[in-house]
Curated annotation (Swiss-Prot):
Belongs to the THOC5 family. The THO complex is required for cell proliferation and for proper export of heat-shock mRNAs under heat stress. Its main location: nucleus. GO terms for cellular component: cytoplasm; nuclear membrane; nucleus; protein-containing complex; THO complex; THO complex part of transcription export complex; transcription export complex. Component of the THO complex, composed of at least e(y)2, HPR1, THO2, THOC5, THOC6 and THOC7. Interacts with piwi; the interaction might be partly RNA-mediated. Interacts with CG9890. The modification Phosphotyrosine is found at Y237. It is found in: Nucleus; Cytoplasm; Nucleus membrane. One of its GO terms (molecular function) is ribonucleoprotein complex binding. Signal peptide: none annotated. GO terms for biological process: male meiotic nuclear division; mRNA export from nucleus; mRNA export from nucleus in response to heat stress. Expressed in ovaries (at protein level). Keywords: Cytoplasm, Membrane, Nucleus, Phosphoprotein. This is THO complex subunit 5.
Length: 616
């Protein structure tokens, strides 16, 4: 448009100059003036177009201005939001959640007691995981609070029940004394001495409650039993028990005084300086339980009670009339008590809530158990607590409170007596085999005396390393170790040029678990259960012997030995028949040396009437 206007202005200027020049020359200027006037019309039209374009430009400029103002307003809003978010970030950084002052569960307790995280736990942030954990712990605490309320109400009911029973017992005592005095003439007429029989020693009343209950039950069992299989007596001095009662009362008064000072606002910390010797001092009186008849080997159990840990312990020792143990296990009394019941090894304090009480004294249950063992006080077995009517919680968190004490204590004493008899017989067998003071041909376990061709030349004790150096499936597939220890022995059986080494492992929980035999035959090479199926079957046949397969009064170790000897004889006789030079002739009565398919040897002995033979 600017170019058009400039062109029109130039043309108009030229036309005016032409008119001026024509006018100066005296020529006619009408046509030129008309043409020039028409140029003004075009100029006017161009001027109008310029005005329209200026107006359109102004409108466009106003529109762009509005857009710029809107953008600036949005920018201000964004800047305000940024400043607000920064303030929120600072506020969040300074924020402290109230759960920081709470004592939350550890990771191990959380994984065991609370439910697992959802499947998309990996995608959750740490904050959301923490919120989930807090929610789970809240539910757990609510459940524990309900359980606490239920237990509290149950405790109140039991207290009311105990109070009513105590009132009944208090009212029953005068009536019983009246009845006793009224029936005394009848006792004298019938020459009864009931008051003398039931009169206890003066020292018994100073026993702690659990030992008192145990002693009374043992006395009742001793009176009703036909044979005197055990005796119980109280060991200790009455003066020491009285002195401990006085010290206990003084200590209680001191603790009450300290508690009063603490409640009155004294913030001084009073620490108990008693060490383990003072805290774990046993009661001066204890029970000595002797199991076994007089004149024979007797098991003496010393049962003590510890008021600090609220449980009883037992320490056992064997009183031998003669050295009957010999090369047997010298710690078999410890093994007998330790494996009397499954999963009751005595390595923990089975008292409910004792860990929390020990924690207040900066002690642990493990420290207490180690101290009791070091001082030869014994171990706190669960079966012993049940004999004393003490409530227990085992490692599986099972609560038990035995109330039928007569039946329970009689069963435990009978079990100890049976285990003691089994261990003594096993020790006698080991001694006889070690010192060779037995006649294998005359033993009742010898099922075929005429055919004993092999001879036992050695029986010695070996180390565990020597036993574990043997490679055997029977040794690898043995049960998992649950506090079980083993004694190992080596027996050598010889026949001609053949020799068999027997490695015997006797577990500490015998007779719950039978002795294990591992066999190695040295004849034309070294034959074991790993490289010879006949030796593997021989091992199985020896180890499959159980007490139910024996005759009454048979010894398990002798029976296993004879099974091994006869199996070795049959192996040599059947294997020797295939050799070029026959060294061992057939002496045992068997029908066939090998089975048709399995090629098994006739190790099994059968007898029907006067007919006996070995078969597969």
């Amino acid at each position: 448009m600017e170019t058009i206007l400039n062109t029109q202005f130039d043309q108009l200027q030229k036309a005016i100059e032409g008119i001026k020049e024509a006018k100066s020359k005296g020529q006619s200027t009408d046509e030129a003036r008309i043409a020039t006037t028409l140029m003004f019309v075009a100029l006017k039209h161009a001027n109008r177009e310029v005005k329209h374009k200026i107006k359109a430009g102004r409108d466009k400029l106003h529109l762009e201005k509005c857009k710029v103002d809107l953008s600036r307003l949005q920018l201000q809003n964004l800047l305000y939001e940024v400043s607000h978010l920064k303030k929120e970030i600072v506020r969040c950084q300074k924020f402290k959640s109230r759960d920081t002052s709470l004592e939350l569960l550890s990771e191990a307790e959380y994984s065991s007691e609370l439910p697992d995280m959802p499947n998309d736990a990996e995608e959750l942030s740490s904050h959301k995981q923490h919120l989930h954990r807090l929610d789970c712990e809240l539910r757990l605490r609510k459940a524990l609070d309900k359980q606490y309320s239920a237990l509290l109400s149950s405790k109140q009911e039991l207290l009311q029940d105990n109070l009513s029973h105590a009132q009944r017992y208090v009212s029953f005592a005068p009536a019983l004394r009246t009845l006793q005095s009224a029936t005394k003439p009848l006792h004298d007429a019938l020459q009864l001495s009931l008051d003398v029989e039931w009169k206890l020693s003066a020292v018994v009343k100073y026993l702690p409650k659990p030992l008192y209950v145990l002693f009374i039950v043992l006395q009742s069992l001793q009176r009703v039993s036909e044979e005197q299989s055990f005796t119980a007596e109280v060991v200790g001095y009455e003066s020491e028990a009285q002195m401990q009662e006085l010290l206990k009362e003084k200590k209680c008064s001191t603790l009450n005084y300290r508690q009063t000072k603490k409640e009155s606002g004294d913030r001084e910390k009073i620490a108990d300086k008693n060490n383990l010797d003072d805290s774990l001092a046993p009661h001066p009186l204890h029970i000595c339980l002797t199991i076994g008849a007089a004149g024979s080997n007797q098991l003496v159990l010393q049962i003590r009670y510890f008021d600090f840990i609220k449980c009883a312990t037992v320490w056992g020792q064997l009183n031998c009339s003669r050295n009957a143990n010999g090369q047997g296990d010298t710690n078999f009394v410890h093994h007998l008590l330790r494996h009397l019941y499954p999963n009751d090894l005595g390595n923990e304090l089975p008292i409910p809530g004792i860990q929390y009480e020990l924690r207040s004294s900066d002690l642990t249950a493990e420290e207490c158990v180690r101290y009791l063992k070091a001082k030869d006080y014994g171990k706190p077995f669960c079966w012993l607590q049940s004999m004393c009517s003490i409530a227990t919680v085992n490692s599986s968190m099972l609560y038990k409170h035995e109330l039928n004490l007569n039946k329970n204590n009689k069963e435990i004493i009978d079990r100890i007596a049976r285990r003691l008899n089994s261990w003594q017989r096993l020790s006698q067998q080991i001694r006889g085999l070690t010192f060779k003071d037995i006649d294998l041909y005359s033993l009742q376990e010898n099922i075929y005396p005429a055919g004993l061709s092999c001879s036992l030349v050695q029986w010695t004790a070996i180390t565990h390393e020597e036993l574990h150096s043997q490679i055997s499936d029977a040794l690898n597939s043995s049960s998992a170790d649950k506090g079980i220890t083993y004694n190992s022995y080596r027996a050598v059986i010889v026949r001609g040029s053949a020799k068999m080494e027997c490695f015997i492992r006797i577990p500490s929980n015998y007779p719950l678990e039978m002795p294990l035999w591992i066999l190695n035959v040295h004849w034309n090479g070294c034959l074991t259960a790993q490289n010879n199926s006949a030796i593997k079957m021989m091992e199985f046949w020896t180890n499959s012997l159980q007490p139910k397969h024996l005759e009454p009064n048979d010894c398990i170790l002798y029976a296993q030995l004879f099974r091994t000897i006869y199996s070795f004889d049959i192996f040599l006789e059947t294997e020797g028949s295939m050799q070029n030079t026959i060294e061992y002739n057939k002496e045992k009565p068997y029908i066939s040396a090998f089975a048709k398919r399995s090629r098994s040897r006739p190790y099994k002995y059968i007898k029907k009437g006067s007919v006996y033979a070995f078969k597969q």
